[in-house]
């Protein structure tokens, strides 16, 4: 049966003469229709190598759908990896709530899935987009593949709403792509149905692809050779308000204590994060506040930095592959492998705690090297191919 839909297919699958006058075709009996749904920059980074791997296979027809949750930042990532979206739901509105995002995503995806009839929907992580896409697929009895499955803090409200999102996705997914053995254990203990595959984390695939080119990161006024640069990223909802004030104060103390350091802080676009950090740090001569870096710039910054202070999950996974210690600006983490493996330390948002641990690494070369040389527990850059193999196995192709 030949169906005319907007899935992307490798041209060698069908006789080109049969495609004349038609937009895009796939042969349903030969190709598995896979829909990747994403909305945020972390999803784009972690799904990009997976999408590229599926698009290079003759067995799959792919569709890339954006919800529009982080349009500009997603577009940057897509360009870096040479990808284009097939659909954009454009759901974002000013001052919308989590309910608004979920409602509009569900409505848009319900209509879209009925139109394109994917045989499997692949989502990543724990965003509202991922949850809504999984739920929309479940409502139409479409199998769901969950990339980065099995992360847990065991506190339903921390992080919020991510912990609930990923638990709920796990209850309805048929394919669980777990990055580590601990994630596999979490899924097994929770009694999920479906197949669990330990694949490693796809962010390592993305990181190694970009890092090979040694991407530049030119920051006006920042001399990378003059300072030990501390790279920081802060965005999590749990750190809004007083915790942000404490984080900013700790950064000032570190800069005061170590005159050979500088702070590079790409600011999140959310004013709730952006404004207090600008007020606290904006006047310091060794603080460099920038707009969000695109992914290649971020990788270049990690490569050149000495130490990372971040509440980002991706940073906890990426930095160890580049030999950079991470201080996690949270009280809990769903990536405890980084802590037990010695590549990261939980420092929370207490001023004294952040300052003390950072000072130890900046003053003690042995302590620094112990973290910098620890083995990354999140994989070796082959996760995307392992995911493709698992989907092939699921469909027995």
Over which residues does each language-model region extend?
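Donor-nucleotide binding loops and adjacent catalytic segments primarily
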Residues: 72-77, 96, 214-304
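A short, histidine- and acid-enriched strand-loop-helix "catalytic/donor-clamping" loop
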Residues: 146-160, 174
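N-terminal subdomain of nucleotide-sugar transferases
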Residues: 26-68
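An aromatic- and histidine-rich active-site surface loop
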Residues: 122-140
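Leloir-type glycosyltransferase catalytic cores
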Residues: 182, 345-397
């Amino acid at each position: 049966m030949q169906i005319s839909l907007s899935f992307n297919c490798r041209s060698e699958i069908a006789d080109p003469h049969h495609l004349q006058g038609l937009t895009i075709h796939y042969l349903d009996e030969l190709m598995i229709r896979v829909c990747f749904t994403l909305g945020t920059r972390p999803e784009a980074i972690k799904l990009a190598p997976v999408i590229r791997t599926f698009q290079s296979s003759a067995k799959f027809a792919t569709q890339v759908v954006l919800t529009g949750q982080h349009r500009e930042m997603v577009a940057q990532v897509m360009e870096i990896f040479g990808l284009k979206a097939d659909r954009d739901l454009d759901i974002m509105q000013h001052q919308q709530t989590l309910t608004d995002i979920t409602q509009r995503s569900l409505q848009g995806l319900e209509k879209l899935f009925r139109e394109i009839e994917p045989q499997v929907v692949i989502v990543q992580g724990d965003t509202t987009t991922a949850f809504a896409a999984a739920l929309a697929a479940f409502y139409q009895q479409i199998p769901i593949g969950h990339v980065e499955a099995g992360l847990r803090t065991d506190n339903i409200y921390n992080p919020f709403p991510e912990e609930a999102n990923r638990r709920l996705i796990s209850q309805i997914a048929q394919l669980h792509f777990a990055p580590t053995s601990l994630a596999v254990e979490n899924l097994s203990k929770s009694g999920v149905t479906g197949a669990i595959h330990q694949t490693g984390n796809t962010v390592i695939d993305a990181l190694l692809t970009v890092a090979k080119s040694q991407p530049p990161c030119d920051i006006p006024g920042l001399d990378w050779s003059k300072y030990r640069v501390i790279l920081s990223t802060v965005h999590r909802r749990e750190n809004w308000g007083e915790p942000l004030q404490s984080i900013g104060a700790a950064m000032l103390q570190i800069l005061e204590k170590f005159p050979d350091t500088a702070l590079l802080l790409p600011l999140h676009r959310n004013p709730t994060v952006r404004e207090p950090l600008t007020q606290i740090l904006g006047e310091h001569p060794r603080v460099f506040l920038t707009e969000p870096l695109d992914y290649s710039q971020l990788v270049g910054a990690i490569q050149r930095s000495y130490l990372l202070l971040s509440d980002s999950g991706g940073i906890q996974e990426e930095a160890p592959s580049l030999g950079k210690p991470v201080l996690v600006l949270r009280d809990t983490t769903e990536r405890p492998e980084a802590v037990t493996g010695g590549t990261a330390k939980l420092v929370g948002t207490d001023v004294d705690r952040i300052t003390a641990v950072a000072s130890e690494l900046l003053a003690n070369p042995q302590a620094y090297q112990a973290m910098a040389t620890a083995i990354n527990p999140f994989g070796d850059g082959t996760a995307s191919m392992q995911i493709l193999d698992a989907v092939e196995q699921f469909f027995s192709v």
